[in-house]
Amino acid sequence: MADSSAIYLAAPESQTGKSTIALGLLHRLTAMVAKVGVFRPITRLSAERDYILELLLAHTSAGLPYERCVGVTYQQLHADRDDAIAEIVDSYHAMADECDAVVVVGSDYTDVTSPTELSVNGRIAVNLGAPVLLTVRAKDRTPDQVASVVEVCLAELDTQRAHTAAVVANRCELSAIPAVTDALRRFTPPSYVVPEEPLLSAPTVAELTQAVNGAVVSGDVALREREVMGVLAAGMTADHVLERLTDGMAVITPGDRSDVVLAVASAHAAEGFPSLSCIVLNGGFQLHPAIAALVSGLRLRLPVIATALGTYDTASAAASARGLVTATSQRKIDTALELMDRHVDVAGLLAQLTIPIPTVTTPQMFTYRLLQQARSDLMRIVLPEGDDDRILKSAGRLLQRGIVDLTILGDEAKVRLRAAELGVDLDGATVIEPCASELHDQFADQYAQLRKAKGITVEHAREIMNDATYFGTMLVHNCHADGMVSGAAHTTAHTVRPALEIIKTVPGISTVSSIFLMCLPDRVLAYGDCAIIPNPTVEQLADIAICSARTAAQFGIEPRVAMLSYSTGDSGKGADVDKVRAATELVRAREPQLPVEGPIQYDAAVEPSVAATKLRDSPVAGRATVLIFPDLNTGNNTYKAVQRSAGAIAIGPVLQGLRKPVNDLSRGALVDDIVNTVAITAIQAQGVHE
């Protein structure tokens, strides 16, 4: 790797929020090149690993272990600076040789600091051949003070012969951004101002519990990861406490203040009041049994923490608690990425680096492109399973990143209450309760008309429209939404059946099938059908191939279709291989411009060396991107085998053949899976609109 493919993040002080900047750089770099690494030249000597490095390693694509991504400790640097820098350079080059680009995150002033620490970082950057991205803290400073800090830092870096590529003034009050921006215009390097975001330094309920030396005595375990956005020491009467409550607040009160406990618990459960993060009972007092029983009867999921500390000590500890952005802090990570996207020209900054043109497509590159493509033309997607926490968390992320517009089905009060408890902002979503919607009876009448040949009456149709999946499908059918994603808590049949009954298939296609987008370390392949049709006929197999090629093209995959069998070319005989041969000819007749080969074995389809001996002149063999399996048994087992043995990321199943997109989730789907599936559905909907 050329040294100019690295960028060095340096700061003159602690608490500048460099991890936010580093996340944004890594996120964009992993979408540009295959192997992105991160390096920490100086770390503390500690039994615990550097949490910032662990956070950033989770967002790299070079696959290097922690031990290879660190240089020296502060102790080594203080003992012999020249030797330490030489060791840093050696360690850096050893890891950088395996990367296309590296983000180097300088020291954090977390050990015995020195007035020359920035100079040391500048000297290291010069020795690594990396331009510097200077990060300063704007919080609690006037615009002139921020400019003065930047001026001193630029001079110091220039003394070390370091090249400063850009300046970021981080953690700036929103109202001060225009003035700080103006104050930095006089400097040569481009400057960016990023606002302060309280969420990034907010402790979680679990971190607050540790800070007050407490223990969680009741409440939903999942809510211990919610961020605490404020602290109230409730020493006043209950009515004044209620006036001061805000979303995400932790309320501290002695355990014997039954009036306050009841008021706060009731407020949390009541519609129109803020959703709290937790209650902290201090003083070592236990709730009176009658009060405890009453609170329990409210069926709150709100975490309740008990501590033996007094009110002052509890409030002081809680107010000074600071949260970390760790590898599991997904909401904070999403917020950091949004801040960088909105306030820093990351693409322009990285354009200063010499980054190799990629010849492969990694999973990170592909998923980034998916989200960008979905974001380019916002579609409205309906999520029928509004009572599932995974759906709500996914919805929050999708809305925060501006990937789609959303309609969520469910009891609006319950959906929004649970979202608030999870720390999820659904302000940008429309929430509809099917049975209470003004569209309910209209949809029932329409459905009864569509299905009258099947004996469906209006009364029966009204019952069916109470089902969120059917109601969501009708929203798509009537253009109130562009697509639907379901299945987190329902079977595939429950998701697909309404679509077949209502939306129906594309003209010329009689089969609804699926593909998985298989993100291998160096490329993305489409596998079909691995989820829907057990034993396809010749005509169905041809439908699957044609639909899969169209779907692959929608996601930037040039379709070259391999019709898979146990033999290649004319070498095999029998009913199974004859079916594949006939389906291949049918595809050629229906889509003469589509490159297709079959029957062909898997290795001959994807390995050029095998193809050279078996099908030398084929435009598909050895280069296939769309692989069509002869039956569901083969397809399903193959995709799972490749997923497990090759470490591939399987995105799907992506349903195809419908007039409008409806996609199914695995009941074990993770939040990332749901986000990707919604993005895919949005891209399919964009194709329908074209």
From Swiss-Prot:
It is found in: Cytoplasm. It is an enzyme of class 2 (transferase). Residues 365-690 are annotated as: Phosphate acetyltransferase. Its main location: cytoplasm. Keywords: Acyltransferase, Cytoplasm, Transferase. Its EC number is 2.3.1.8. Pfam families: AAA_26, DRTGG, PTA_PTB. InterPro entries: DRTGG (IPR010766), P-Actrans_bac (IPR016475), P-loop_NTPase (IPR027417), P_AcTrfase (IPR004614), P_AcTrfase_dom1 (IPR042113), P_AcTrfase_dom2 (IPR042112), Phos_Acetyltrans/Butyryltrans (IPR050500), PTA_PTB (IPR002505). PANTHER family: PHOSPHATE ACETYLTRANSFERASE. This is Phosphate acetyltransferase. It comes from Mycobacterium tuberculosis (strain ATCC 25618 / H37Rv). The lineage of its organism: Bacteria, Bacillati, Actinomycetota, Actinomycetes, Mycobacteriales.
